[in-house]
Curated annotation (Swiss-Prot):
This is Elongation factor P. Keywords: Cytoplasm, Elongation factor, Protein biosynthesis. It holds the Pfam family EFP. It comes from Bacillus cereus (strain AH187). CDD domains: S1_EF-P_repeat_1, S1_EF-P_repeat_2.
Length: 185
């Protein structure tokens, strides 16, 4: 059990028959009445975000999430196959479970699979990934007004805004949290 006064971003808790990750929290001490903690939580099973208020000092159960290093192997219809690097055990995850992460996954990529009491919750991506540009408009020389960008389609189908000097075939570093261009690889 952990006190809500000890909340921090990224903490995983078990509340109301669900597993929740703390995205944001704020301790509120009104002039009149008892203090409370206002929090923004993401359900690890469904991905939905919810705001919840706790009384100050209230205790909640801390959920111990296990992260296993795995390698993304291939897509098989509507499911995607991952392999544990140590035991060579393979697991399949449905497209709905990893819908957002699919835009960044390449074959043989190392990821972290989050599990809770044997149940697979989802995929945790690295902060950045390297993806190749498959389609973009050619850059025009002399068109160097400040911060000019153009859309580029990457090898996974993800479309990001990139500077005009980026050409097809180049490899880019993409931030997985925001889905934005960082730099050339």
């Amino acid at each position: 059990m952990i006190s809500v006064n000890d909340f921090r971003t990224g903490l995983t808790i078990a509340v109301d028959n669900g597993l929740w990750q703390v995205l944001d929290f704020q301790h509120v001490k009104p002039g009149k009445g008892a203090a409370f903690v206002r929090s923004k939580l993401r359900n690890l099973r469904t991905g939905s975000v919810q705001e919840k208020t706790f009384r100050a000092g209230e205790k909640v159960e801390k959920a111990h999430i296990e992260n296993r290093r795995m390698q993304y192997l291939y897509a098989s219809g509507e499911s995607h196959v991952f392999m544990d690097n140590g035991t060579y055990e393979q697991i399949e995850l449905g497209e709905k479970q990893i819908e957002r992460e699919l835009k960044f996954l390449k074959e043989n990529m190392e990821v972290s699979i989050m599990t809770y009491q044997g149940e697979v919750l989802g995929v945790e991506l690295p902060n950045t990934v390297e993806l190749q540009v498959t389609e973009t408009e050619p850059g025009i020389k002399g068109d160097t007004a400040s911060n000019v960008t153009k859309p580029a389609t990457l090898e996974t189908g993800l479309v990001v805004q990139v500077p005009i000097f980026i050409n097809e075939g180049e490899t880019l570093i993409i931030n997985t949290g925001e889905g934005k261009y960082v730099s050339r690889a």
